[in-house]
Swiss-Prot record:
Keyword field: Oxidoreductase, Selenocysteine
EC number: 1.21.4.4
Function: In the first step of betaine reductase, the substrate is bound to component PB via a Schiff base intermediate. Then the PB-activated substrate is nucleophilically attacked by the selenol anion of component PA to transform it to a carboxymethylated selenoether and the respective amine. By action of component PC, acetyl phosphate is formed, leaving component PA in its oxidized state. Finally component PA becomes reduced by the thioredoxin system to start a new catalytic cycle of reductive deamination.
GO molecular function annotations of the record: betaine reductase activity
Pfam families found in the cross-reference section: GRDB (PF07355)
InterPro entries: Betaine_reductase_B_beta, Various_sel_PB
Protein name: Betaine reductase complex component B subunit beta
Catalytic reaction equation(s): acetyl phosphate + trimethylamine + [thioredoxin]-disulfide + H2O = glycine betaine + [thioredoxin]-dithiol + phosphate + H(+)
Catalytic residue list: 349
Root EC class: oxidoreductase
Taxonomic source organism: Peptoclostridium acidaminophilum (Eubacterium acidaminophilum)
Length: 437
């Protein structure tokens, strides 16, 4: 009997929900939570261990989390490693991809995971492993787990894995020599394809070329002291009554909120409606996501000309790239009308960061220098944000509530200052700016 190990997050490992998203890595003998379902559909293998780690812990302390999990595996024998399914949960998808990639590289064992097409982990890891095409929520658990097991069973049995479209995983960009059953030569196939194209019929290319959507880096701000700076967020900060009825996930709406005369955003007046993380910290102090207080300080010091009268907000969790791009284009109109010179984008969880980076590209495409502040740097980088400043966490990007107000302020002030400086820097390639606090 072969041995398998499964990685799960805190939810599917039955530890808890968002309140346990900081759960530290743990390895358990046998099957827990979703691992029991996997064990029931594996053939010729048994899930001997279940690894559980909170999504926020993996996202915020990735190196430590990976190191500890690698330590768990040092004395374990296993023939295959699986993770998920992650559905459309961005943090979970990125975590599954990260740990599978390291396990594959270190232990030279096959790895399998599953994600929805809109999960940012797909673009990040589909070339490195079998990423099964999954559903968008846990209602697809049984189907997605069975699909993972189907490929795993073939691997365990030493059977040949077929093409991506037949097996149900995302194409990995690998080409193999294949003998067609019909024996039709390339010369005939290309003529058939051309005739279909000329007659307007559907046809399938044998060599898909991936499209690159990198945006030219906008010209930097020359004089920050005269510039108007706006904040856009995918972190869901809105007035407490949510006047624009922005959805808490898979958003199709956005809002613009007047901050004229406000020194900071007060809890109880503003809140987050974002369903992708524990809202407690952001509800208590919305400035940890929309750093109005820090921007006002820089405005008074003369570092920037002024803060734009409005901030713009939507929810990024589960939001499709198409909707993100559309909303960004609509916001661009308002930015132009408001005479904005530069933009700071703040983002939180995985799909939220993917949504934010997609919006960043559209805003930069319109000519605005823009920087994305986020915790999940690999997601922003993969999607194509050109200027990135790290934040400290998913639920509270710019202020850890477990620290003093003074410490939170110093961190927020410093990192927002770094973002403002980034708007003035002329870079020729994607750049992650270093922070000191």
């Amino acid at each position: 009997m072969k041995k398998a190990i499964l990685y799960l997050n805190q939810f599917f490992g039955q530890v808890g929900g968002e309140d346990k998203a900081d759960y530290e890595p743990e390895i358990i003998n046998g099957q827990v939570g979703a691992a029991m379902m996997l064990n029931g559909v594996l053939e010729g293998a048994e899930v001997t261990h279940t690894i559980i780690c909170g999504d926020n812990f993996m996202g915020t302390y990735k190196d430590e989390a990976v190191s500890r999990i690698m330590g768990f595996l040092e004395d374990k024998e296993f023939d295959i490693f699986l993770a998920g399914p992650a559905f459309q949960a961005g943090r979970y998808g990125v975590a599954c991809g990260e740990i599978c990639k390291v396990v594959k590289e270190k232990y030279n064992v096959p790895v399998v995971t599953s994600m929805h097409v809109e999960n940012p982990g797909v673009q990040m890891f589909k070339k490195d492993m079998y990423v099964m095409i999954g559903g968008n929520n846990a209602g697809r658990m049984r189907q997605d787990m069975s699909a993972m097991a189907k490929v795993a069973n073939k691997i365990i049995a030493g059977e040949k894995i077929g093409p991506a479209d037949e097996e149900g995983f995302f194409p990995r960009g690998k080409r193999h020599q294949h003998w067609r059953e019909d024996g039709k030569p390339a010369s005939e196939r290309v003529v058939d394809m051309l005739l279909k194209k000329l007659s307007g019929e559907e046809f399938q290319t044998e060599l898909p070329i991936p499209k690159s959507d990198r945006v030219e880096i906008a010209a930097p701000i020359k004089d920050l002291s005269k510039a108007t700076i706006a904040v856009v967020t995918t972190g869901g900060i809105v007035p407490v009554d949510n006047p624009d009825r922005i959805q808490s996930a898979s958003a199709t709406r956005w809002g613009m909120y007047d901050v004229t005369g406000l020194e900071r955003l007060e809890g109880g007046v503003y809140k987050t409606i974002h369903a992708g993380f524990d809202p407690a910290a952001a509800d208590a102090d919305p400035n940890v996501i929309v750093p109005l207080d820090a921007l006002r300080a820089y405005e008074k010091e003369g570092k920037i000309g002024k803060v734009h009268e409005y901030f713009y907000s939507t929810v990024g969790t589960g939001t499709t790239e198409a909707e993100a791009a559309r909303m960004a284009k609509e916001i661009v109109v308002k930015l132009k009308q408001g005479g904005v010179d530069g933009v700071i984008m703040t983002s939180t969880u995985g799909t939220c960061t993917r949504c934010g980076a997609t919006m960043v590209k559209e805003i930069e495409r319109a000519g605005f220098p823009i920087v994305q502040m986020c915790n999940l740097i690999p997601v922003a980088s993969t999607v194509g944000a050109n200027k990135i400043v790290p934040t400290i966490s998913i639920p509270y990007p710019l202020g850890d509530p477990s620290t003093s107000k003074e410490q939170q302020w110093k961190l927020r002030y410093h990192r927002v200052g770094t973002a403002l400086d980034a708007l003035t820097v002329d870079v020729q390639e994607q750049t992650i700016f270093k922070v000191k606090i």
